[in-house]
Curated annotation (Swiss-Prot):
Keyword vocabulary terms for this entry: Cell cycle, Cell division, Mitosis
Tagged with keyword Cell cycle: yes
Family statement: To yeast SPO12.
Name of the protein this chain belongs to: Mitosis-specific protein spo12
Top-level taxon in the UniProt lineage: Eukaryota
GO cellular component: a single term: nucleus
InterPro entries to which the protein is assigned, alphabetical: Spo12
Function field: Has a role in controlling mitotic cell cycle progression at the G2/M transition phase.
Gene (name only): spo12
């Protein structure tokens, strides 16, 4: 009988079901995030100081604008160049 009890214990331990991992966590996560989303009107808030610029920022903007104005125009692709040459010939 001891062997049958040991066999039954071994079989019962093998037959134990393994619970699957929780797959619902993704849907729960989405539900939680949806509750915490900002309202759309809150994203369009403008501060009264948005139009103000510090002297340092103004200087940096002027410096950047100066270099952007001096830059070379972008190189046109070969197809655009050929089209412009053909239109000039006509």
């Amino acid at each position: 009988m001891s062997e049958t009890q040991a066999d039954s214990i071994a079989k019962s331990s093998v037959e134990t079901t393994i619970q699957p991992l929780h797959q619902e966590s993704a849907t729960l996560r989405q539900q939680v995030l949806q509750k915490h989303e900002l309202p759309k009107h809150a994203l369009n808030v403008a501060s009264p100081t948005d139009s103000l610029m510090s002297p340092c920022t103004a200087k940096l903007q002027a410096h950047k604008k100066k270099y952007y104005m001096k830059r070379k125009p972008p190189v046109m692709s070969l197809q655009n160049t050929l089209q412009s040459v053909q239109t000039e010939k006509e």
